[in-house]
Amino acid sequence: FYVHGAVFAGWIGLLLVQTSLVAGGRTDLHRKVGALGALLAIAMLILGTVGALIAARRATGFVGVPVPPLQFLAVPLFDMVLFPAFVALALSYRRRPQYHKRLMLLATIVLTTAAIARWPGVLELGPPAFFGLTDLFVVALAIWDRRVLGRLHPVTLWGGAALIVSQPLRLVVSGTDAWLAFARWATGLLG
C-alpha cells in the first residue's frame, strides 16, 4: 500500500507541475510530460483496483471502515471507473484547454474522497462527510466558472453531476445482491 500511496501522491505532484508548465507558457513540455501522466493514470487504475480488492479480502476489511468490506468495495471501485473516464476524456480534449483542464481537475477530485475519508473524525461521520467535503471542490469549480465565464462550463456541469450522482448510487448499489455477487467474484480473481 506504500507504492499505491506514492503513486497517487505522484499524481498530485504531476498536476502541480503540469499547471505550472502551462502557466509558464511551456505547453510544449506540458504535452511531453502529459504522455507520462497517461502512463501514471494507467498505473493508478491498476494499483487502485488491486488495492481495493486486496482490502476487501482482508479479514479486517478497509481500515477504520465500519461497513462490510464487500459492500464498501463499491466506493473505491466507482472511483476507479470515474478517474480513468475523466482522464481519457481529458486526453481526447487536449486541444480544447477549457475542457481538458476541467476534466483533469475532476479526475483529481475523484481521488480526494479516499484521502478526505482518512482525515481524523471524517470517516466516523459517514458518507455525507467524506463525499460532501469532496463535493466542495466541485462547488469551488462551479463558482469559478460563474465568476469567470458567467455560466457553468459544460464539463463542470456534466462531469460534476456525474461525480456527485455516483456517490449515493454507490451506496444504493453496494447493498444489493448483484453487487455483493460481483464483489465476491472480483475479489476471487486475486486467487
Question: Which stretches of residues belong to each language-model region?
Answer:
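Alpha-helical membrane insertion/targeting regions
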Residues: 1-191
